[in-house]
Amino acid sequence: MTYSKEIVREWLDQVAERAKEYPEWVDVFERCYTDTLDNTVEILEDGSTFVLTGDIPAMWLRDSTAQLRPYLHVAKRDPRLRQTIAGLVKRQMTLILKDPYANSFNIEENWKGHHETDHTDLNGWIWERKYEVDSLCYPLQLAYLLWKETGETSQFDETFVTATKEILHLWTVEQDHNNSPYRFVRNTDRKEDTLVNDGFGPDFAVTGMTWSAFRPSDDCCQYSYLIPSNMFAVVVLGYVQEIFAALNLADSESIIADAKRLQAEIQEGIENYAYTTNSKGEKIYAFEVDGLGNASIMDDPNVPSLLAAPYLGYCAIDDEVYQATRRTILSPENPYFYEGKYASGLGSSHTFYRYIWPIALSIQGLTTNDKAEKKQLLDQLVACDGGTGVMHESFHVDDPTKYSREWFSWANMMFCELVLDYLDIR
């Protein structure tokens, strides 16, 4: 059993009581919250935890963290759930050591996934080998939050230490992608699924930031320095320093020194290269830059995103540059911002035209101090569930019954986070 049904039921009843004015929210919340626990989580023979992303039979390092993060509230009082989350960290770190460039993995070494179409250094554990900086940020975030929220430290084992070293090494190598062994080519007509220049990626100059091949949408980067992911890296490198200083883990001194250096260099790169101006002449963050003078003004609905910067802990909600960036990306100046009959929000190159993502609507609510805006977004999310009672990857702004992905656990859990945030359960 991955959790105590009695403890979780008691907690759900407490949430329902707090939200009794909003029965529609409660209905969707309970369905989403229990579905992830009951249908995506599996405890493996070694005690580690595998978390299915939903309707794709694989585990993403990013998604799995986001899927279990809302359970940290209950994990304080449920030892089984606490061990389930610690088991996920252990599985994530083990898989990172199988290949730190991969974004998603199989439950066993079964060679399932994109092996027939992809030209890259694959092994049987890998479902897909699209290198995304955030895939390495998320497991560090979960390990840290589990410790801070519950006091759990069993996740900080020898594998965690070794994987942390590997992450620091990879991010350092990718500060100059010319030194990288990573290449990725897919046999496809969809240009977003492969890298240009024979799998090397687009042209760039060294900036101090760390290079990324793909976005958290699993679409390739137009320019190779993805600003939201570098922001996230700065945050989790601070977590690494705090963990190793407080718990005196193996090789603490060298790991702290490497994390501190890398954090400073990436932050300096952000400060030197990440800014641009919007159509009003306001200073904003670019979404991607290449160090050669090119920058994109847009945002993607997946997390990390520019919209999510305060949610990730990179800046305050009232930060002036963030607010200018927020206004820009929630406007037609962002080519992936769509407005329609039922909703408005962020879409993606990964999905159809005029389809927006519930994940981004949840993040919009989690990054405002305006209670009325949070309520409006929650009402919108529930009204746009396509009659299914759960969230989806995306839906059409003029017809929510048109949506992508029947079962997308990450979106379900982001909705749950926004409900808890609205109820001041943090």
Please place each PLM-identified region on the residue numbering.
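Low-complexity, Ser/Thr/Pro/Gly-enriched N-terminal "stalk/linker" regions
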Residues: 1-62
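Aromatic-rich carbohydrate-recognition surfaces in CAZymes
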Residues: 57-85, 89-191, 409-425
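Extended, well-ordered alpha-helical scaffold segments
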Residues: 28, 79-95, 152-172, 240-243, ...
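Extended ligand-binding clefts on enzyme/binding-domain cores
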Residues: 97-101, 108, 168-234, 247-249, ...
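C-terminal capping/lid segments that line or modulate ligand- or cofactor-binding pockets
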Residues: 118-124, 129-132, 296-316, 354-426
